[in-house]
């Protein structure tokens, strides 16, 4: 499996990079230790950060929103998922508990400010490309109606788009039956140490999701 970034994105967003982790896993419903960390450590820390600088003051959220503008998408109407998570924390709503992979994915996103997505590779066909959503392009979102992905940076395989930093499609969603996963960090900041983020993400996935045989790589 190859992952690459198409010129339709690179020409508009020079700083775009992808941090990738591919691994084997037995997905479970919940990890209590992870939720202890989220509720007792991460959520209170983020409330303080948001009070101090605001959500738009978080550098990696801001750079992601700038990337959307460069591609011709309104980031206030189509929010990057990391901003949506921060807004839930600000409003005291916490996070939805999904499963050990998705919950760890959300921890990574909260800690970095970047959107992250996790995808079941048995439902991904061929190579993966990050490209600009085509005119009129849509897909069925997880827990949502059809999402307009025109001008969004979208992940696509040989069959079409299946993911984005805003909301993923149902095609490759992670379930309790998933066994081979790609977790991908959408990085739109040239200053961020992506290798360091990948190492921390690997640690979290091993600890909280039971991930094994993790391969990490970056795409520019």
Task: Locate predicted features.
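Charge-biased, low-complexity intrinsically disordered regions
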Residues: 1-220
